[in-house]
């Protein structure tokens, strides 16, 4: 065989093979590679969107958690304030009740002292009358000397 004819035949076979590959094999390969590239790009984009969504959700969750903590602190502060107000109110009521009881006790004591003084005055008046009777050896008329006895009670 001739080297030129073999080389020429190989070139024709090569170009026919190249044409068949370029016409029937290469487009599906390029299409498959493009589809895979597109899927990879879509996957990367979806991953990026997911990452952004996760960051956004994480920020929102952190904000909600911070808000919940602040509300909890505020509720605790309000509860402490109400408890302090209740304690102050109870303390004020107790002080008012104690003052009322003390005032009532003082009034009762004053009334008992006044009553005891009146009883003592009456007894002293009776004793004074008896003493005067014994001194004078005569009976003093309580009706006749009522004004004098009342004056004596008032002075005692």
Swiss-Prot record:
GO CC annotations, alphabetized: plasma membrane; proton-transporting ATP synthase complex
Domain of life: Bacteria
Membrane-protein topology: Single-pass membrane protein
CDD domains: ATP-synt_Fo_b (cd06503)
GO molecular function, one term: proton-transporting ATP synthase activity, rotational mechanism
Residue ranges the record marks as coiled coil: none
TM region positions: 7-27
UniProt-listed InterPro entries: ATP_synth_B-like_membr_sf, ATP_synth_b/b'su_bac/chlpt, ATP_synth_F0_bsu_bac, ATP_synthase_B_chain
PANTHER family noted in UniProt: ATP SYNTHASE SUBUNIT B, ATP SYNTHASE SUBUNIT B', CHLOROPLASTIC
HAMAP family assigned to the protein according to its UniProt record, in alphabetical order: ATP_synth_b_bprime (MF_01398)
Full protein name: ATP synthase subunit b
Gene transcribed to yield this protein: atpF
